[in-house]
């Protein structure tokens, strides 16, 4: 498929040096800078462009007669013939171009001179505008570089001042007061640095289980204390203290009850 397209384009688009310059007026009015088609294409497309090279698989007898065209260009190298499709619309496009006429045989006409002068004036104006644009761009670049240098100077001065200043000392640890500490976090350090033990808040489930255990046995063994501590997520010290307090309360209640009963019995004694 690719070879089909390449072979079909070979005859239609000749090489860069052989490519004809499209001219709508008299061929004698063409400027010197546009006589060489290779230089025209290189100037139009920039950076050494020599046109489209699709000469792969070209035969000696192309659509345009490449051999005859090369000989005609060698004979009249100083002229630039016009393309037959514009100069002779009646002839076929597949026929070879006619032989070019010498420059001396063609008399310059005032119209062609004016056309040539218009082209030169256009070329001069375009060159002047290009020069003005380049100078404007260069001036803008100069302003940009100057502003960049001015911006770099304060930045460098700021860096130097930052390096000269001593680095600030790391902030000290904030002071923690006793009322800022959280309670009931760990049961291992209940006393704390100040020596005051925190009050333990028992849940309803823990209180109910401890009351049941106290109802069956007022004194716990070490093994039973460890089991209750694991079951209620408490420490052995907390279990021990709770049972001590509960026994003291029980004794107080019993003492008051016995004293009240004794007082009541002595009052009713005959």
Curated annotation (Swiss-Prot):
A motif (Antp-type hexapeptide) lies at residues 176-181. The keyword Repressor does not apply. GO terms for cellular component: nucleus. It comes from the Eukaryota. GO terms for molecular function: DNA-binding transcription factor activity, RNA polymerase II-specific; RNA polymerase II cis-regulatory region sequence-specific DNA binding. Keywords: Developmental protein, DNA-binding, Homeobox, Nucleus, Transcription, Transcription regulation. PROSITE patterns: ANTENNAPEDIA, HOMEOBOX_1, HOMEOBOX_2. Residues 195-254 bind DNA. Residues 119-134, 154-166 have a biased composition (Low complexity). Residues 60-175 are annotated as: Disordered. It is found in: Nucleus. The keyword Metal-binding does not apply. SMART domains: HOX (SM00389). Pfam families: Homeodomain. GO terms for biological process: anterior/posterior pattern specification. Forms a DNA-binding heterodimer with transcription factor PBX1. Sequence-specific transcription factor which is part of a developmental regulatory system that provides cells with specific positional identities on the anterior-posterior axis. Also binds to its own promoter. Binds specifically to the motif 5'-CYYNATTA[TG]Y-3'. This is Homeobox protein Hox-A5. It comes from Lemur catta (Ring-tailed lemur). The gene is HOXA5.
